[in-house]
């Protein structure tokens, strides 16, 4: 049975309303983005961020994930980076730089060695309007983060990264499976 256009518009409206509710809630609770709720949800389920965690947040701006981490991590280290500027967050070292540059990765390695417990990446490529191309470009960023994470994560380290469903999804999933003992996907 084919959905009517009205039903499709209604679903789009419901999705926007749901997202808007998270936007409003994030602002009322002082979070910089609604992405904060996803990290809270994941950490409540898996408890991978603890008070002594060493955490790297890639693609951090505007800082929702770093905010959440800073409320939990009191004895560890948080390093956040993004090409865009980000307002200061207590107990977070922020660097405005390009993760893909060798000098940035060398700096991260110098600060963390292979002692990071958690790597977060909410990086997304700038959108072009071409959904397929945008998906591929963002998933390539995810693949770069997967490769780099293997250099700085401890043996039981955790990587949380944005990944889009698209034509290269299975390739990136396979790469993650080669590099990590356990791979799970969440929406």
What is each stretch, according to the model?
Residues 78-80:
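Short beta-strand "acidic-cap" motif of Rossmann-like dinucleotide-binding folds
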Residues 50, 73-74, 153-154:
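Helix-to-beta-strand junctions that scaffold the AdoMet/dcAdoMet cofactor pocket
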Residues 1-51:
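Class I SAM-dependent methyltransferase Rossmann-like catalytic core
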Residues 53, 76, 157:
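Glycine-centered, small-residue-biased loops immediately flanking beta-strands
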Residues 62-74:
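Conserved SAM-binding loop of SAM-dependent methyltransferases across substrates and taxa
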Residues 56, 89-92, 104, 119, ...:
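C-terminal substrate-binding/active-site "lid" region of AdoMet-derived donor-dependent transferases
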Residues 83-128:
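S-adenosyl-L-methionine
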Residues 51-61:
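Conserved class I S-adenosyl-L-methionine
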């Amino acid at each position: 049975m084919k959905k009517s256009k009205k039903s499709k518009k209604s679903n789009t409206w419901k999705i926007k309303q749901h997202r808007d509710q998270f936007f409003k809630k994030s602002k009322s609770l002082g979070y910089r983005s609604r992405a904060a709720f996803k990290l809270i949800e994941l950490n409540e389920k898996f408890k991978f961020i603890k008070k002594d965690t060493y955490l790297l947040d890639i693609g951090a701006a505007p800082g929702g994930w770093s905010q959440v981490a800073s409320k939990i991590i009191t004895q560890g280290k948080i390093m956040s980076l993004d090409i865009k500027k980000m307002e200061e967050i207590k107990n977070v070292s922020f660097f405005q730089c390009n993760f893909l540059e060798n000098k940035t990765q060398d700096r991260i390695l110098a600060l963390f060695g292979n002692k990071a417990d958690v790597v977060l990446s909410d990086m997304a490529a700038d959108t072009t309007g071409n959904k397929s191309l945008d998906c591929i470009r963002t998933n390539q960023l995810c693949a770069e983060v997967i490769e780099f994470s293997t250099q700085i994560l401890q043996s039981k380290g955790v990587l949380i990264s944005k990944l889009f469903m698209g034509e290269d999804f299975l390739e990136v999933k396979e790469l993650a499976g080669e590099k990590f003992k356990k791979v799970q996907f969440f929406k």
